[in-house]
């Protein structure tokens, strides 16, 4: 091979790499996203090499200055990517050698691409994971603010996608607030797996130098050092745990979007999205489509698929490093970007939508949403056994359906024909929509008192998250 064509690993080879080897082996088309972490890790590694006497102070200065120059070149799009250099790590090292010659070739002392790459990925997960955490907190804050303004809005609560019971809209919003708190904690847990130094493990057996891994740990701001070089370079548990967290979050995101799609439809109509967050049809002029919600619902499948991709890839690998692991980054990068834009889209929709109380009331009445309250009235006030009460109310609902009426407009004689207790103010209070919500007085329930209590707890939860970003 000529000097220009020679790989950084090419000393053992006499033949030029085939075109298919270069095309299938290149990863710079996607792993260029690790350039910041690679330069961060390389600067720390260079400082450690100076610490143990491999580099002089002048050499370290040249390496640091040149690496920062390369970072600027990458950010300004001035560094051309070449498939023969395979990945971002080789591009940076090759450019470093161009800039400072033989000194640049010293940087890879006591380091393999195996430990270099896994360390870069860990740093990437820590950085982007913290940004995702901030986005989750921002979304939770939007839900909290919307819930505060929605306490007096009564909407249907659904089971089996059928009208079940009246709830305050704040209860619905806070249900997702708490789900996202679990996602937040899952991400915090998942990030701990990446908060570890793998650099210094070499190819897999360690290196023939008395490297200072504690120094590296402190330079990179990490909490611990991997105790076993084989495990450190080959494990992808940190990516798996991160993708598990992404998957759980996107399942919640998809379900929120499903609700938005349904609740904004003509059939439900209990909320409206503004024109700026919806699209029209190329043929049907009346259409107003919730595309953001539909796209996020679709994107959730991608993230679930990314997790499955990595699980299947890892299950049959022998110890330690295998080239298959190059494919882990595609799943990781796509999941990060998908989660970030999905959180932003959901937050915009939540802050934008308006409730339609009159449609909510109509659904509640036509869905006999206070039938359970009426049965409880018979049990508590009239001492009717619950099963008997259940049967009486069921009969009353059947009469309403047959007459195409609701519990609110069925004539009193027809009600009395079912039960003598279905009369007067007591009956009206028993089927009242607003009173129904306020009867749910158990902790965590939808009564106004419990909602105000829950909002205080939610605010306290948000305040506690401030420590995440100090």
From Swiss-Prot:
GO terms for molecular function: argininosuccinate lyase activity. InterPro entries: Arg_succ_lyase_C, Argininosuccinate_lyase, Fumarase/histidase_N, Fumarate_lyase_CS, Fumarate_lyase_fam, Fumarate_lyase_N, L-Aspartase-like. The keyword Transmembrane does not apply. Pathway: Amino-acid biosynthesis; L-arginine biosynthesis; L-arginine from L-ornithine and carbamoyl phosphate: step 3/3. One of its GO terms (biological process) is arginine biosynthetic process via ornithine. It comes from the Bacteria. Its EC number is 4.3.2.1. PROSITE patterns: FUMARATE_LYASES. Its main location: cytoplasm. GO terms for cellular component: cytosol. It is found in: Cytoplasm. Keywords: Amino-acid biosynthesis, Arginine biosynthesis, Cytoplasm, Lyase. It catalyses: 2-(N(omega)-L-arginino)succinate = fumarate + L-arginine. The keyword Glycoprotein does not apply. Belongs to the lyase 1 family. Argininosuccinate lyase subfamily. This is Argininosuccinate lyase. The lineage of its organism: Bacteria, Pseudomonadati, Spirochaetota, Spirochaetia, Leptospirales. The gene is argH.
